[in-house]
Amino acid sequence: MAAPFSGSGTKQDPWLLKTPSGTSDISMYKDPSANPPALVCFTSGTELRYHLRAIEDLHQMLKAHGDWMELGNADEQKPAKDGTVEAWGRSPDNPVGGWYGLKKGLRGRFGNYVPPVLEALGLVELEHNPRNNRVRAI
């Protein structure tokens, strides 16, 4: 079941979401005028930025994967578990050739903050357990 959310994804009306575990609030919006275009995330007073194309790219990757995939959340300074959304979000083999995160030192946690946006857009099914959540394309 999709987590409740509100907002339209603009700076004036951001998506108000929760992390997959439901333990943290996140506010996200699209900033297409940024260079490069960004998906902006605010959580616990911290701003993170990801390539805006992450929404479409992640959805396409999950569709091609065809099954559930672990999120595998990890900070930038920690290695990501192979075969997870987090590992894909920093892989040299993804469409951007590396990190989707744009702010050095805050490029991790892709698997924690980007999938809830895809869920809000109706693109994925996302688990909401205390730990070890997974995602799959719809």
Task: Place the predicted regions along the sequence by residue.
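Long, low-complexity, charged/polar intrinsically disordered regions in eukaryotic proteins
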Residues: 2-80
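Generic low-complexity segments that are intrinsically disordered, proline-rich and/or Lys/Arg-biased
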Residues: 15, 93-96, 117
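Short, hydrophobic-biased segments on the C-terminal half of alpha helices
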Residues: 59, 112-116
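Short helix-coil junctions and helix-kink-helix linkers
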Residues: 83-109
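C-terminal engagement modules used by replication, chromatin/transcription, nuclear envelope/ESCRT
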Residues: 134-138
